[in-house]
């Protein structure tokens, strides 16, 4: 038989859209001769649904979408992840749909408790394993943490599974795939059972799911590896109750994976929240340069605008480098001096509050004031156009508080909030290896905030 993995990008709360995407995957799988197709965890509702699960209308919409899937699926078996309801309880569920009926439903038994989604707050815990027999093959069905956190090898052996199917919404972090391989290897070593993983792909708020679904046979050999950060429908051929070796997508370098994760995070945050585009302050520095490169790669040059807002402390080379980069990427670039506004603010403060400018340069007020003027202008443009402001601060700056509240922190999405300053430089070098979009001087030049003389 043939099994299809539906590595799809679902949107939280868009049950009709998610159902349509699942049905499209089902159609492709049927045309390719698959007898079974599996989706990621909670594919029907999107992941993580969080407090939407507390809304009756949301839960009803999930149930309606599931009913629609049941009616539409024919000639193939579908295992779909969804919120499940039984006896007044809510579960993280996977239902087996076959010939217009739900023939089995599995309820997740190990619930995630993470900073971004505490499943135990919303879901009840399942108690029973699920066994699906299809085409003479005995499948065990698990959902994400059941496999990653549970010791299932004894149960799998006792149940005499041939293949374990894992529906996952496993979020990306550096070297995450290595960890997945290790856990799967360990399970196979103890059980001798093949494993098929179907993982979610896409950005959802601050999370990025990398996909990278894979299959390992009972010898612990990787037989299929789907791509990272892309949707895919992949067929796995099963012979003698084992997956036959198929397509192995070449793994990307660490920098390539990180860069693609950042691009997908930006793309889906903008797309799924309905923003027409993005804008950012381009300073001529390395952080805003990398943010711009990511934004353009994610959204396209026509959907990104940049604003250079120099003061009397801005060096000419900053103006030149910002202009050059905007030209290299083909984005609409504005230049708006804040010098007059800055001086008017200082005069107003001096006149009304009898606060004299600090000649020693020890006060942060004039520096923060410049950042806040820039933030105000960017937010005004955002309100006018509907485009989201991308902030450009990196993880190192945020961690030590080297940033300005209501200034460079003003915006809707912090692209580099989990990227250290050292990694910023590495990512700039990586991006320029593909094509030169960041002027070399931006990367090589010593960093400066340019908020006071000779800084």
Model regions and ranges:
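Generic hydrophobic alpha-helical scaffold/packing signal
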Residues: 259, 263-267, 283, 292, ...
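Mobile late-domain/C-terminal helix-loop "cap" segments
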Residues: 435-455
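Active-site adenylate/phosphate-handling loop in enzymes that bind or generate adenylated species
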Residues: 108-112, 117-129, 136, 158, ...
């Amino acid at each position: 038989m043939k099994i299809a993995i539906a590595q799809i990008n679902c949107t939280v709360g868009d049950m009709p859209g998610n159902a349509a995407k699942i049905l499209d995957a089902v159609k492709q799988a049927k045309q390719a001769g698959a007898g079974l197709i599996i989706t990621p965890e909670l594919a029907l509702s999107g992941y993580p649904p969080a407090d939407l699960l507390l809304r009756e209308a949301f839960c009803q919409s999930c149930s309606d979408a599931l009913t629609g899937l049941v009616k539409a699926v024919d000639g193939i078996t579908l295992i779909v992840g969804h919120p499940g309801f039984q006896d007044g309880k809510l579960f993280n569920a996977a239902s087996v749909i076959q010939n217009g009926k739900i023939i089995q439903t599995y309820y997740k038994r190990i619930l995630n408790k993470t900073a971004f989604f505490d499943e135990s707050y919303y879901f009840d815990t399942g108690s029973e394993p699920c066994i699906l027999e299809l085409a003479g093959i005995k499948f065990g069905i698990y959902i994400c943490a059941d496999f990653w956190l549970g010791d299932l090898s004894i149960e799998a052996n006792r149940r005499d599974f041939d293949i374990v199917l894992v529906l996952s919404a496993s979020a990306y972090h550096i070297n995450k795939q290595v960890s997945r391989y290790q856990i799967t290897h360990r399970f196979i070593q103890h059980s001798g059972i093949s494993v098929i993983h179907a993982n979610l792909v896409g950005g959802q708020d601050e999370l990025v799911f990398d996909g990278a679904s894979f299959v390992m046979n009972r010898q612990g050999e990787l037989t299929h590896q789907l791509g990272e950060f892309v949707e895919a429908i992949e067929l796995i051929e099963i012979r003698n109750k084992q997956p036959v070796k198929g397509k192995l997508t070449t793994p990307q370098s660490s920098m390539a994976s990180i860069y693609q994760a950042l691009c997908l995070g930006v793309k889906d945050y903008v797309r799924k929240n309905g923003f027409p585009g993005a804008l950012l302050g381009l300073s001529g520095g390395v952080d805003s340069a990398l943010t711009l490169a990511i934004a353009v790669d994610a959204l396209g040059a026509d959907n990104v605008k940049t604003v250079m807002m120099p003061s009397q402390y801005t060096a000419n080379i900053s103006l030149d480098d910002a202009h050059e980069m905007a030209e290299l990427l083909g984005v609409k670039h504005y230049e708006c001096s804040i010098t007059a506004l800055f001086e008017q603010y200082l005069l107003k403060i001096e006149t009304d509050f009898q606060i004299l400018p600090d000649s020693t340069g020890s006060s942060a007020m004039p520096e923060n004031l410049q950042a806040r003027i820039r933030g105000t202008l960017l937010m005004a443009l955002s309100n006018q156009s509907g485009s989201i402001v991308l902030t450009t601060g990196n993880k190192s700056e945020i961690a030590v508080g080297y940033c300005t509240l209501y200034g460079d922190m003003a915006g809707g999405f912090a692209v580099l909030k989990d990227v250290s300053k050292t990694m910023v430089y590495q990512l700039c070098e990586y991006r320029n290896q593909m094509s030169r979009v960041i002027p070399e001087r931006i990367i090589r030049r010593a960093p400066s905030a340019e908020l006071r003389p000779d800084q």
